[in-house]
């Protein structure tokens, strides 16, 4: 019996495999699509772990000493995780709102701001001189507040005369201070874009310059006064980002019971501005927290506040924020 030499031979096909280029491209595309989905899921997981605040832009109206209520509103928004001061993109402030806005931009926490207000002897930040009224059109030069602003700037930036460009480079927050030019009748928006080399301290001093009380600021022969006169609520600056913007408006009640000259004086000013601001307030109602309540002993030129009164203003701010949250979120 003859054994064939081929019985135990294994034949191997060593020819090159063939691939369809179109199929390979499709497979690569599918892999990339799956990879993108994985990345998206990962991002969603991270976002859930690190919750983003709803609002990153903040608008703060004027309101004189009643601006303390802003702090209560902000505290409530932070507690509800609607706002995070460490993640702000932009802050626009007028008058008292400009002062508070500066503290926020400089990185103060809401607790630090509240402690600052409680420890501040408000009656010592003004030194009225009624002999100035005829010569300077005001009774208070605002020097004490101006020096306070520069001390605060120095403590956080090491630069007393810091300008808007420098402040933006340090903080990354778009800070806008609103002023009014009495000479040209123009509203002025001080920020790192429009006025990059303008001193922040001067802009805030201009913005808090309540007519009739603080003397106007003269720059180059032009007079500058309180930003609230021409735009007390600059929500218009964020018209394209309303979904990310929240504003706080300190409302003046329009009544006919004038106990002080200051109330009578402000009622006249409010009468001139009433129609304009009524329209503005309603236009941005969905983005506005209205603070309507104030203690009876608080009026615009009264800087002598005890801590009990400050606390009431703070609590009225919290109440206003609670009402806003209830109407906007809880009822949906």
Swiss-Prot record:
Keyword Glycoprotein among record annotations: yes
SUPFAM superfamilies documented for this protein: FabD/lysophospholipase-like
Annotated PNPLA domain residues: 58-239
Glycosylation sites (chain numbering): 2, 13, 307
Protein's membrane topology: Single-pass membrane protein
Motif DGA/G: chain residues: 226-228
Subcellular location: Membrane
GO CC terms, sorted: membrane
Chief place where the protein resides: membrane
EC number: 3.1.1.-
Membrane-spanning ranges: 90-110
GO BP terms, alphabetized: lipid catabolic process
Gene Ontology MF terms: hydrolase activity
Pfam families hit by this protein: Patatin (PF01734)
Record keywords, A-Z: Glycoprotein, Hydrolase, Lipid degradation, Lipid metabolism, Membrane, Transmembrane, Transmembrane helix
Primary enzyme class: hydrolase
Bridged cysteine pairs (disulfide): none
UniProt motif (GXSXG) ranges: 93-97
Name of the protein: Uncharacterized protein L446
Organism name: Acanthamoeba polyphaga mimivirus (APMV)
């Amino acid at each position: 019996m003859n054994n064939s030499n081929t019985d135990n031979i294994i034949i191997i096909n060593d020819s090159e495999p063939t691939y369809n280029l179109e199929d390979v491209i499709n497979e690569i595309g599918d892999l990339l699509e799956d990879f993108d989905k994985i990345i998206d899921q990962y991002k969603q997981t991270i976002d859930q772990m690190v919750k983003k605040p709803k609002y990153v832009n903040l608008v703060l109206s004027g309101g004189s000493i009643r601006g303390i209520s802003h702090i209560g509103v902000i505290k409530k928004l932070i507690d509800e995780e609607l706002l995070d001061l460490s993640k702000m993109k932009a802050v626009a402030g007028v008058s008292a709102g400009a002062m508070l806005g500066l503290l926020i931009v400089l990185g103060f926490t809401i607790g630090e701001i509240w402690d600052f207000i409680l420890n501040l002897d408000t009656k010592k930040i003004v030194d009225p001189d009624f002999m100035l009224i005829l010569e300077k059109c005001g009774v208070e030069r605002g020097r004490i507040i101006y020096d306070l602003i520069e001390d605060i700037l120095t403590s956080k930036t090491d630069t007393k005369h810091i300008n808007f460009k420098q402040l933006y480079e340090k903080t990354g927050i778009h800070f806008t201070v609103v002023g009014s030019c009495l000479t040209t009748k123009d509203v002025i928006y001080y920020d790192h874009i429009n006025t990059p080399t303008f001193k922040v301290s001067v802009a805030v001093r201009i913005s808090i310059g309540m007519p009739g009380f603080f003397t106007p600021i003269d720059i180059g022969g032009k007079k500058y006064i309180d930003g609230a006169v021409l735009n007390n609520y600059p929500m218009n600056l964020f018209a394209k980002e309303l979904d990310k913007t929240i504003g706080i408006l300190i409302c003046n009640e329009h009544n006919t019971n004038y106990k002080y000259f200051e109330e009578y004086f402000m009622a006249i000013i409010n009468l001139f501005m009433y129609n304009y601001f009524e329209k503005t307030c309603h236009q941005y109602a969905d983005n506005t927290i209205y603070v309507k309540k104030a203690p009876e002993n608080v009026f615009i030129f009264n800087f002598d506040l005890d801590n009990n009164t400050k606390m009431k203003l703070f609590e009225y701010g919290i109440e206003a924020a609670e009402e806003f949250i209830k109407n906007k979120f809880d009822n949906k």
